[in-house]
Regions:
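One-carbon transfer enzymes
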Residues: 1-225, 267-270, 276-278, 300
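An anion-binding loop in the catalytic cleft
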Residues: 210-300
C-alpha cells in the first residue's frame, strides 16, 4: 500500500528526493515550500507544478494554519528536505509514522543548516546522508538510515550537493517503506563527535593568502556558488569560483605570472573561473582580456 505523505522542501537538494518519491508511487498529498520572493519559483515549486501536486508557500502562513491543514490531510509521514522552517511539536507528532528529514551529512557530525559546505571547508574526506525522525532539536532525532560518501578534491558545494541528494533520495524511499512495514527500526543518535554547521558568512569566504593552497581551494569549493570566495584588488571585490593548485612559491598574495597565478602560504593557486562585481562569471582567458594587473603586485 502506497504511503500518504506531504513533502516539505525548497532548494535544489530537495528535488531528487521528491522526484524519487513521486516515481516510486508515494501518494504526495501536498507540497510545502518556503519562498519569500513571489516572482521566482523555488525548485520544489517548479516540480510540484509540473506534476500537478498541490503546493503551498508557507512563507506567509502561520503555525496554527499550517497545523490545521496538516491535520486535515491525515498523513502517514512528512518528508522534510532543505525546507528552511522549523516545525512545531504538534506538526512533528501529527503523521502516523512521524516527520523525516534528509540531512546532508553523516550525523552527528555537522548538525545544522550548512553541512555540505562545512564538510568541504573542514577538509573532510568523507561525509554522508542521514535520514532522521525529527524531534524538537536541531538534527538530533533518531536515525532511520545513513550512508557514507567520499568527498573528492574537486568537489564543490554544487557537485557534492548533487551527489548526496541522489543518495538521500534512494535512502528515504527505501527505508520509509521498510519502517511502515516494521522491517527496520530507529536508532538513537550518538552525541560523540557532534559538530555544528552554521551558514558560511561572507567574511569566512574571503581568501586569506597566508593560508595553504589546499585550504584556499577548500574555501573556493565550499563557497561555490554562494557566497563565492573573494579577494579585493584595488578596491574591487573579485570572486573565484574554480581554481587549481600550482607548484610555484612566493610571498603570500603576490601575482606571480601573466596567467594570474597567486602565491599562498605554501604553493600557489591559479583561478579558472572568476567574476568581477556586477559582471558575469568568466573563464580565466576571457577574464584577463578585460582585467589589467602587474606581475609582482600584492593582492589585498
Amino acid at each position: 500500500m502506497a504511503l500518504r505523505i506531504a513533502f516539505m522542501g525548497t532548494g535544489n537538494f530537495a528535488v531528487p528526493v521528491i522526484s524519487k518519491l513521486y516515481n516510486n508511487k508515494f501518494v504526495i498529498e501536498k507540497v510545502y515550500t518556503k519562498n519569500v520572493n513571489k516572482n521566482i519559483k523555488t525548485p520544489v515549486q517548479v516540480f510540484a507544478e509540473k506534476t500537478s501536486i498541490p503546493c503551498t508557500n508557507v512563507s506567509f502562513m502561520d503555525d496554527v494554519s499550517l497545523f490545521k491543514e496538516i491535520q486535515n490531510l491525515k498523513l502517514e509521514a512528512i518528508v522534510v528536505v532543505a525546507f528552511g522552517r522549523i516545525l512545531k511539536k504538534n506538526i512533528l507528532n501529527e503523521p502516523k509514522f512521524g516527520c523525516f528529514n534528509v540531512h546532508g551529512s553523516a550525523l552527528p557530525r555537522w548538525r545544522g543548516s550548512a553541512p555540505i559546505q562545512r564538510s568541504i571547508l573542514a577538509g573532510d574526506r568523507e561525509t554522508g546522508v542521514t535520514i532522521i525522525k525529527m524531534d524538537e532539536g536541531i538534527d538530533t532525532g533518531p536515525i532511520l538510515a545513513t550512508k557514507n560518501a567520499t568527498i573528492e578534491n574537486s568537489d564543490t558545494y554544487t557537485t557534492l550537493e548533487n551527489k548526496l541528494s541522489q543518495i538521500g533520495a534512494e535512502l528515504i524511499s527505501e527505508n520509509l517503506i521498510k519502517l511502515s512495514q516494521s522491517e527496520t527500526t530507529l536508532k538513537k543518535q550518538e552525541e560523540t563527535g557532534t559538530t555544528y554547521a552554521k551558514k558560511i558568512s561572507k567574511s569566512e569566504s574571503k581568501i586569506n593568502w597566508e593560508t595553504s593552497a589546499n585550504q584556499i581551494l577548500r574555501v573556493i569549493n565550499a563557497s561555490n556558488p554562494s557566497p563565492g570566495a573573494w579577494f579585493n584588488y584595488k578596491g574591487e571585490r573579485i570572486k573565484i569560483f574554480e581554481a587549481q593548485k600550482i607548484d610555484k612559491v612566493g610571498n603570500p598574495g603576490i601575482i606571480l605570472d601573466s596567467e594570474l597565478t597567486i602565491s599562498c602560504g605554501d604553493n600557489s593557486i591559479q583561478p579558472i573561473q572568476l567574476q568581477r562585481a556586477g559582471k558575469k562569471i568568466l573563464n580565466i582567458n576571457d577574464f584577463l582580456l578585460g582585467f589589467k594587473f602587474s606581475v609582482g603586485e600584492k593582492i589585498n
